[in-house]
Curated annotation (Swiss-Prot):
This is UPF0437 protein AZC_3451. Signal peptide: none annotated. Belongs to the UPF0437 family. Gene3D superfamilies: Helix hairpin bin (1.10.287.660). The lineage of its organism: Bacteria, Pseudomonadati, Pseudomonadota, Alphaproteobacteria, Hyphomicrobiales.
């Protein structure tokens, strides 16, 4: 499996993980003020997940651009 294919598979997993993180944050916001103490933890997890996904997408673009050259 090439680096590009491996990264695409990773992005697919990260995308699913990011949707789950987004829903966790959404669910938490709907239940406020219950569990307000977990806002920072859930928000940080969501941020980290989306940051990792964005970084992987940038790397994929770079790899694809390099492969096309």
């Amino acid at each position: 499996m090439s680096d590009i294919e491996t990264l695409k598979a990773e992005i697919k997993k990260l995308s699913a993980k990011s949707v789950n993180a987004k829903m966790n944050l959404h669910d938490l916001s709907e239940d406020l003020p219950t569990n307000w103490q977990s806002i920072l933890e859930v928000a940080q997890e969501t941020y980290n997940t989306f940051k990792t996904l964005e970084d992987a997408r940038k790397k994929l673009k770079e790899l694809e651009a390099g492969a096309a050259a």
